[in-house]
């Protein structure tokens, strides 16, 4: 990275357990070092970059990615806001501190706007700051089914602002029927995005199959008509911890059939989504 040496000289990385050098961890096909967001100077450096390189350039939200903090040296040392601590004790907290730093930068830059952020990684509490998704899923009917169930579990666990990469992120492109069904399912989730890096070098796009484009358009139009409802659900989730995606048994526990294996779910209390 062009600014790696600068950051290392300023001591903004998590440090190796045996030296004061930055820790080195495997990243993709090489090595890298992780920023230490328990160091106030790191937070300030990050926020300056978010502001000058993104927000001032017209990009008004942040996608906090590759933030699992897979530091292989569990004893690697973190600043700990003045009380040094090993990364193994606070690993899940690091992405939370990262997204909070991004949130604060956006709030300071545009205090009149409600900030929108995404994070790939995190833990309980991340719903205070960001929207998230199920990660790099693979194109298949099974993925569509199990992503839906994963989203319900996340919603019941407090991570209510969730969704999945519609059509699958990796693998070959979806066929027309799978793509339509995935879009129809996806528009009923808090996060709806068609996002891909297909193995066959194609790109998932709403118009990729002209024969089903009208069905795709209809589903997306429904999404826009439901925006006031989504807005209300998001407020209720924020204020009262109300799950946006709800297994049918959550509101109908006296109906034994709702406990049978089923892919249907409720969007809020009032819309039943047949899957």
Residue locations for each model-derived region?
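Catalytic-domain carbohydrate-binding cleft regions of carbohydrate-active enzymes
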Residues: 1-275
């Amino acid at each position: 990275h062009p600014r790696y040496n600068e950051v290392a000289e300023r001591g903004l990385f998590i440090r190796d357990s045996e030296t004061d050098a930055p820790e080195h961890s495997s990243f993709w096909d090489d090595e890298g070092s992780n920023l230490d967001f328990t160091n106030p100077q790191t937070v300030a450096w990050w926020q300056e970059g978010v502001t000058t390189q993104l927000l001032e350039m017209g990009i008004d939200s942040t996608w906090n990615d590759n933030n699992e903090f897979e530091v292989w040296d569990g004893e690697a040392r973190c600043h700990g806001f003045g009380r040094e601590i090993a990364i193994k004790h606070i690993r899940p907290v690091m992405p939370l501190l990262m997204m909070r730093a991004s949130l604060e930068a956006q709030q300071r830059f545009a205090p009149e706007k409600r900030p929108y952020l995404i994070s790939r990684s995190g833990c309980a509490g991340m719903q205070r700051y960001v929207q998230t998704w199920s990660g790099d899923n693979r194109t298949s009917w099974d993925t569509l089914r199990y992503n839906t169930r994963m989203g319900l579990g996340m919603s019941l666990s407090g991570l209510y602002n969730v969704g999945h990469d519609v059509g699958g992120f990796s693998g070959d492109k979806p066929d027309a029927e799978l793509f339509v069904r995935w879009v129809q399912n996806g528009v009923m989730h808090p996060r709806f995005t068609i996002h891909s890096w297909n193995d066959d070098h194609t790109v998932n796009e709403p118009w990729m199959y002209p024969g089903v484009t009208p069905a795709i358009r209809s589903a997306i139009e429904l999404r826009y008509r439901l925006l006031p409802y989504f807005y209300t659900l998001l407020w209720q989730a924020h204020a009262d911890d109300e799950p946006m995606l709800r297994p049918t048994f959550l509101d109908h526990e006296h109906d034994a059939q709702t406990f049978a294996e089923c892919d249907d779910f409720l969007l809020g209390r009032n819309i039943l989504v047949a899957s």
